[in-house]
Design a protein with these regions (language model features):
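A short acidic, amphipathic alpha-helical/loop segment
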Residues: 5, 129, 151-155
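Accessory alpha-helical/coil subdomains and C-terminal extensions
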Residues: 61-145, 229
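Proline-centered loop/turn at the N-terminus of a beta-strand
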Residues: 12-15, 165
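ATP/nucleoside-binding phosphotransfer catalytic cores, i.e., glycine-rich phosphate-binding loops
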Residues: 150-229
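Internal gly/pro-rich beta-alpha loop/helix module
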Residues: 16-88
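Short beta-strand segments
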Residues: 15-18, 52-56, 117, 141, ...
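Single conserved hydrophobic/aromatic residue that forms the stacking wall/gate
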Residues: 1-11
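Short, ordered loop/turn segments at secondary-structure junctions
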Residues: 19-22, 143-145, 172-175
Length: 229
């Protein structure tokens, strides 16, 4: 849609906001957040920073922000990085700059890319349930820096051999997924098998990134560079 194409446009400032307390609750934050979002969107310093999320006097990059509490007004946080800036009484303060972004001209995205989260005692049962003929890609939410049980790692080989891209993120709230351990199922072995290690994103956003890449026609080394960049 034209709306989705506009998000993140270098010439437009896109700011998302909302409320954690409805208008009939004491201390409703909706109107204040709306005003803050307008201030951010109208500030020249907000140009070319991608899609922003403004809540509770903080400015976050939509790429990294996540909800951390069910009801708290300060629920939206950016793990590891922190916010890009703050809403002050008289001005908008940015103390970080957004990194350059790759943009694709896509009308829509489609494809089957499920998310599987690792757990103690996991074997190959979940991957066995997948229809490999319909599968476009897979996101693995791994332990720690990027490790999964041995049996699961062995089963991933069948996907990789069929050319199905597998991307890995950490289950941890903070930190970066990276290959550290060399045992069967460890990150080093997974990377050698062809698993992509996605930095800084959670599983849901890694899924969207992989879908965007596949719909943009990225394959092989170009796909790896984009997913791990």
């Amino acid at each position: 849609s034209s709306t989705s194409r506009g998000l993140g446009d270098v010439y437009k400032r896109q700011v998302l906001t909302g409320a954690m307390r409805s208008s009939n609750e004491l201390g409703s934050d909706g109107v204040y957040n709306y005003l803050s979002a307008l201030r951010v969107a109208s500030d020249d310093k907000s140009a070319d920073k991608g899609v922003l999320v403004v809540m509770n006097d903080e400015i976050h990059a939509a790429k990294y922000v996540t909800k951390t509490h069910t009801t708290n007004v300060g629920t939206f946080q950016t793990p590891t990085h922190g916010p890009l800036g703050l809403i002050m009484k008289q001005e908008i303060l940015y103390f970080k700059t957004a990194e350059p972004r790759v943009r694709f001209d896509l009308d829509h995205i489609q494809g089957l890319v499920p998310i599987i989260s690792a757990y103690a005692g996991m074997t190959d049962e979940l991957i066995d349930m997948l229809d490999l003929e319909q599968l476009d890609g897979l996101i693995i939410q791994a332990f720690g820096a990027g490790n999964i049980p041995k049996e699961t790692a062995e089963k991933l080989e069948s996907l990789l051999q069929k050319g199905i891209p597998v991307a890995l993120v950490s289950r941890c709230f903070n930190g970066i997924a990276e290959p550290v351990y060399a045992y069967q199922g460890g990150g080093v072995q997974l990377q050698k098998s062809g698993v992509f290690f996605v930095k800084e994103l959670n599983a849901q956003k890694a899924r969207l990134k992989l879908l965007i890449a596949l719909n943009a026609g990225l394959r092989g080394q170009a796909l790896k560079d984009y997913m791990e960049g």
